[in-house]
Amino acid sequence: MRSPSSPSDAVVIVGGGFGGLFTALALQRRQPGCPIVLIEPRDRFLFQPLLYELLSDELQTWEVAPRYDQLLNNGICWIQDTVVRIEQTCQTIELASGDRLGWAQLVLATGSRPNDFGIPGVQAHSSGFRDLKDVGRLKQWLNSLGQQRDGNAGLIVVGAGPTGVELACKMADLIDGAASVRLVEMGDEILPSSTAFNRERAQAGLERKGVVVQLNTSVSEVTSSTAVLANGSVLRHSGLIWTAGSNPSIPAISPAPVLERGRLAVDADLRMVGSTNSFALGDISARPGSPWPASAQVAMQQGDATAAAIASLRIGEEPQPFQFEDRGEMLSLGVGDATLTGMGLTLAGPLAFQLRRATYLTRLPGLSLGLRSAGAWLLSR
């Protein structure tokens, strides 16, 4: 990893998820000579919409989680470190290693972290579904339950948003009747933000796979073998996956930034309110009056828009406002099944599954990686 030739003139991007990585790659295409620094502590980018296919071994690790040193070429300096403090006035960043960096433009795209709502036992006795460690843990649970085939064993998924619904469908297919799968949701319906078509198809898929859906149910405590509900009843489990919420993961910033609904408030061009050269994207940002969904497609589009905005600033022009283009929603409903709406399509079943996966594979960062992955998938048909 090399340092940019002039750190004080660099574009520094904090966070290598969808927003950060796509900003870096798009900016390099627009301004090949621009010094770009990407700060990300992990060694792999994670394409989370395809994490379900990694759980079922339908895709391989290199396809879903490519290494940053394979995605980034010599035009982008990757620093594998963690930001501990950002000083806006003097435009410096302090890293966990003790190093300091200056910037000309700053992009914050640090994503989110799980929200346990302070419920006892969630951190100690549950798994999330956000990274490769979580995938490995769930694979171990599934293998163990498959070998035991204990009729009293069961998995509980808490939270019936997209992650919870997709995960419950996938695990029900993989466990193949060796244990029960239960989806617990505090609200009165699954997928409250989805289209009616996707919600209905998901409900039908859950029923077909034997997933028990328990609505209007809140968890008050989690132990190694039980989930205690708010009404006092107890559910036994052999593994509990928590997908019930997230919080923005915002680094320490001085002076304190303006917040909107607990996120960094941004103007129409994604610059932080009160700043001329600092941007915030994805799950950590919010535009007053414009509730963008917390999704990969928003972060990817914001990455492209931020790259264009920075390119404009560096030649003395004002950025254009960000315009989100809703391209619809695609949901995995288990092995070989999916539902999607958007771009003029309303589709469910095996064809939707193939279209969803092909669409995501071609969106993998780095053209060669996307083509390799799509080619590998086509050869497996």
Regions found by a protein language model. Name each.
Residues 6, 308-381:
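C-terminal, flexible cofactor-proximal segment of oxidoreductases
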Residues 124-151, 234-301, 308:
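FAD-site-proximal beta/loop scaffold in flavoenzymes
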Residues 2-77, 156, 165-194:
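Beta1-alpha1 glycine-rich phosphate/pyrophosphate-binding loop at the start
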Residues 36, 295-315, 330:
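An active-site-proximal "capping" alpha-helix that borders the catalytic cofactor pocket
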Residues 76-86, 173-268, 319:
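A Rossmann-like FAD-binding core segment of flavoenzymes
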Residues 80, 146-151, 180, 315-326:
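A short alpha-helix-loop-beta-strand transition element characteristic
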Residues 16, 110-111, 117, 231, ...:
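Glycine-rich, N-terminal phosphate-binding loop of Rossmann-like dinucleotide-binding domains
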